[in-house]
C-alpha cells in the first residue's frame, strides 16, 4: 500500500462526525440533483502548506496535512462511499492534488491550468453503469469529490446535468450515441496511452441515463458516429446548461461522475504557493469485488485498470 494512503486511512478510522449531515440526507440530495455541496467541519486555512508546484511537494504535504486528509476520507465512509484510486494514475495516492504542477504545464488535466478543461466524465475508458463489468478490471468511478483548500477568483468547476444535455439532443443523435461506435482514449492523467473501441457514449439502465462523454478523448468510428458526437460537444459548450460551483476553502462538492459532466476554465498559474488547490477523491457506491483490486492483500482501494 502507498505509505501515505496507509497513514490517512488509519487516521480516518479514528475520526468521526466530519460529514455535516446524515448519510440518508446526503444521498437523497446527491441522487436527486446529481451533486451536493457540503462543508468539512473544523477546517482551518491557517494550517495549510503552500500549494504544491511539483509532485514531491505534494507527497510531503500529504504527510503534513494527514489529519485533514484522514477527515476527508472519513466523510466519504460516513456517506457510504468507498474511496478508490486507479492503477496507472496519481502514483497510487487516494487523494489527488488538483493544482497546477510544473510537470503538467502542457497537459489538459486536473494538474494543468493554461488550457480550458472541457466537459467530461473521469476515467471514461472503464465500464460504466449498465454495462457488463470486466471480471478483473475496476469500473468507472460513481462519484468524484473536490474539496477546496485554496480558491482562485474567476476559476470555477462547472457541472452539467446529463439529463438536461440529453433533453436538448435530437432523438436520432441520442440513439447513435447509444451504439458501440466510439473509441475512448485513456485520459492524460494516466500513464501510457491505452484506448478502448466499440463502446457507446450513452447507456440507459433502469430508465436512467449514464455517460462516458469526454470532450477531449472520444472520437467516432464512423461519419455518423462522429457527427452525433459533434452535436453533443456543441450542446455541452452551451453555458446556459452549466452550473458554476464557486467553492470556498473548506467547501466540497460531490457529484455523480456518470450522471454529470464537469469542466474548468483556464487560468495562468503563478507557481508561487498561492495557486488554486483542491483535493480530489474518486468513489464507488459499493465496495469493489476482490477481483477488481490490484493487490487485494495490500490495499482494498487500489483498482486494476489493465491486465
Task: Give the residues covered by each predicted segment.
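Active-site environment of non-heme Fe oxygenases that use a 2-His-1-carboxylate facial triad
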Residues: 1-21, 34-38, 44-48, 97-249, ...
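N-terminal non-catalytic cap/leader segment that marks the start of a structured domain
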Residues: 1-101
